[in-house]
Amino acid sequence: MRKFSPLFILLFTLITSPARADFNDGVVHYLMGDYEKAFTTMQSLAETSDHGYAQYYMGMMYMKGQGVDQDYKSAGKWFRKASEKNIPQAQYKLGDLYFKGRGLPKDFESAYIWFSVGAAHKHPLSVNAIKKAKTKLSEEELKEADKVIASYVKKYGPKEEVDPKQPIKIENE
């Protein structure tokens, strides 16, 4: 088991707190409908700190035209970045853009792949979307997609399951 010193924990908290505070501010602006401020805050985080959920919100704002002109291609770019940070909501949205051909080429195989990765996280919309995407693919396409899915789930799927009955131990070195 990995051990963390109290100093490491303190430094990690101090380093990550400003990004967390900025993200929380961005979410508040978004929920209050102040999309221009939300966009500015999220854009800074998404670009400089590589924050997955900030990237997801960037995709949402581009997709809906909130605080920025609607641009499905840019939405796809941000959903892809967030998807690669294991954000299941972004994986669903990316699959949906591929399925509908909005900002990205209509590609049922890519849609099926990203819906499947989202479903590995047990994201309910992804679980349901797999069925409709699957009906659009041939047996050959499904076989090819399944190879990619296995690789993507390892990279972008849920990480190690945590047993809630086991406490997380932080020990001094």
Predicted regions and their residues:
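Sec/Tat signal peptide C-region and signal peptidase I cleavage site
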Residues: S17-A21
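Hydrophobic face of amphipathic alpha-helices that form TPR/SEL1-like repeat modules
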Residues: D22-H29, S44-L45, Q55-K64, K93-K100, ...
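Canonical positions in the second alpha-helix
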Residues: S44-L45, K81-A82, G118
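Short helix-capping/linker turns of helical repeat alpha-solenoids
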Residues: Y30, D34, E47-G52, K64-Q66, ...
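TPR alpha-solenoid repeat register
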Residues: A54, A90, S126-N128
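Terminal, low-structured helical/coil segments at or just beyond the last alpha-helical repeat
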Residues: V127-E173
